[in-house]
Design a protein with these regions (language model features):
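Alpha-to-beta junction loops
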Residues: 157-159
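Glycine-/small-residue-rich beta->alpha transition segments that form the dinucleotide
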Residues: 167
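Conserved "HGTGT" condensation-loop signature of ketosynthase/thiolase-family condensing enzymes
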Residues: 1-133, 137, 151-154, 170, ...
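Short conserved active-site loop signatures built around small residues
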Residues: 142
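Short, conserved alpha-helix that lines the donor NDP-sugar binding/gating region
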Residues: 146, 150
Length: 562
């Protein structure tokens, strides 16, 4: 259990948590329809910061994304006396695309686009001296970041975690979701019979968490879990298995009657809302009120999990279940309790659930508590098998393997020579090909291939360059206004965690899948995170390591089972 000591939200609705909460309670939203905005041909509805806000938040030396995150963090830190220079403080940044809008300028040096670089810029500006960790786990990134903070603090790696979720919007993200036919040009309607898709939004939200309580009965994160559907990289499973497993993990031994509400992801896409309703019902929580906040903020991507957790804390403090804006008539098969009106509650607990591309699902349990209640488990594990792949060679458990070719041709040769029974390999982006081949060789060495689902193995990977190769491929499809054709096949791979989803699908792994980005490779920090991740008592082993693909001549995979 870890404890909230401060929070902050910046969005089009306001620049403090209080301003945002009061706006939502009053039913206000900043969703606006845009026609030909940023020269995007198709109309869309989104919640974007005003030009006045952008100018007010501007900081010399920081990008728009970095400045928004910085201001949110500073807004939270002002409520504390935290010494951010201390070695017991860590910054955890949650984002899906960070500085991706810089890619349109086609820079020779791509490193400013890497999310870990952005995190380091923010940390340096704040004076934080420890290495920042970026969580890039698709739409569940914010919840994943809170869970990572919970684990690192419970494992006593740090005493304080500054968790900031942030994303800005731009032609890259908006056209990408449009290419998937997921965007509505009208205000979204979560869980509604007439829902037609999501709206995107901009926001930054920060939670400062502590290992020890700072007040008698404040908000705490008691449990958190991430589980995978092992079904499809861009579509949730029909039975909501990953979400159900995540809910089951955080509610074990808890009385549902104590819950004020479940704050769902509620994107207003056809399949997400349907899946969540089924998962909630299957988890036995269909008598608990459910709400969603996308009708106020839009889908704020990497900010969503943090923003919506903070808002849920504020609502429960106000004894209020916030209404689901845009909802009128239930349009999902799961029999869940929804309303577009605010309602009263005396509950002192809530669940925040979320799902994302790559098959990932996350959930956390927020409670009012002043009591330390750690659920740490033994985290001592040994590496049993290792695989290393470079552009010129591959080794398995220290033994060099026969192969031909160099660069990307090497990966194709390894696939044909040692695997050759999974044609989807040829549809994958380079990062996924690298991770897929490395994992296949690793599991062959382990000799424990299973055809039935298992949730006791996690997949936790790290890198520096995120999904830069897929990003460039997608950017090429929208770069030229005369040859504008956003590619859904390319866009779906513009998240590095997709490689964890591909491995999970191949092997029926329904345990945790997480992806972290560091400014530079740091084996000690990676081991710290992996060991802390074993705090999830369901996880018995981890397929983990470093998977980085900067270009066809510069890539490395070093993965292992522990």
């Amino acid at each position: 259990m870890v404890f909230k000591i401060a929070d902050s939200i910046i969005s089009p609705l306001g620049e403090t948590t209080g301003e945002n909460y009061l706006a939502v309670k009053a039913g206000r939203a900043k969703l606006c329809r845009y026609d030909h905005h940023w020269q995007i041909p198709e109309p869309f509805t989104a919640s974007l910061l005003t030009e006045e806000q952008n100018q007010r938040l501007k900081i010399e030396g920081l990008t728009r994304f970095e400045a928004m995150a910085y201001h949110s963090i500073v807004g939270a830190l002002r409520q504390t006396n935290l010494d951010v220079k201390a070695k017991n403080v860590v910054l955890i940044l949650s984002t899906t695309k960070g500085n991706i809008e810089l890619l349109a300028e086609q820079p020779a040096d791509k490193s400013p686009i890497y999310p870990g670089t952005a995190a380091q810029h923010i940390a340096d500006k704040l004076g934080i001296t420890t290495t920042p960790i970026t969580v890039c786990n698709a739409c569940i990134s914010g919840v994943s970041a809170i869970i990572l903070a919970l684990r690192l603090l419970e494992a006593q790696c740090y005493d304080y975690a500054i968790v900031c979720g942030a994303d800005t919007q731009n032609p890259f993200t908006i056209s990408g979701f449009q290419s998937l036919k997921a965007v509505s040009d009208e205000a979204c309607k979560p869980f509604d019979l007439e829902r037609t898709g999501l709206n995107l939004g901009e926001a930054a939200a920060t939670l400062v968490l502590a290992r020890e309580p700072h007040q008698d009965k404040g908000w705490a994160i008691k449990r958190g879990a991430v589980r995978n559907d092992a079904f499809h990289i861009s579509s949730p499973s029909k039975n909501g298995e990953g979400a159900r497993l995540a809910l089951a993990a955080i509610t074990e031994g808890e009385a549902a009657e104590g819950l004020a509400f479940i704050n769902a992801h509620g994107t207003a896409t056809m399949f997400n809302d349907q899946m969540e309703s089924v998962a909630i019902e299957r988890a036995g929580l269909n008598e608990t009120p459910v709400n969603a906040y996308k009708g106020y903020f839009g889908h704020t991507l990497g900010a969503a999990g943090v923003l919506e957790t903070i808002l849920s804390m504020a609502a429960a403090d106000d004894h209020t279940i916030l209404g689901t804006r845009g909802f009128e008539e239930r349009g999902v098969s799961g029999k869940i309790k929804l309303s577009n009106q605010n309602a009263a509650t005396n509950g002192q607990q809530f669940i925040k659930m979320i799902s994302g591309f790559g098959g990932c699902n996350g959930a956390i349990l927020g409670v009012k508590s002043g009591e330390v209640n750690s659920e740490r488990v033994n985290s001592e594990k040994l590496m049993t098998h290792t695989v290393e792949i470079t552009p010129k060679a591959v080794t398995v458990d220290g033994k060099q393997m026969a192969c031909e070719g160099e660069g990307k041709a090497l990966l194709t040769d390894l696939y044909k020579r040692y695997i050759d029974n999974y044609p989807k390999f040829y549809k994958m982006d380079p990062l996924c090909r690298l991770g897929f081949v490395a994992s296949e060789l690793l599991l062959q060495a382990e000799g424990d291939r299973r055809d039935t689902p298992r949730d006791d193995r996690a997949i936790i990977l790290f890198n520096r360059s995120s999904s830069i190769q897929a990003d460039e491929a997608y950017q090429a499809s929208i770069q030229d206004a005369e040859d504008y054709f956003p590619s859904p096949a390319a866009f779906v791979y513009t998240l590095p965690n997709i490689v964890t989803g591909e491995i999970a699908i191949r092997n029926h792994y329904q345990g945790e899948t997480s992806f972290y980005i560091l400014p530079e490779r740091n084996d000690q920090l990676m081991q710290q995170i992996l060991k802390a991740s074993l705090g999830d008592k369901t996880t018995k082993s981890i397929l983990g390591g470093w998977i980085d693909y900067e270009d066809d001549e510069n890539f490395v995979a070093k993965v292992f089972v522990m």
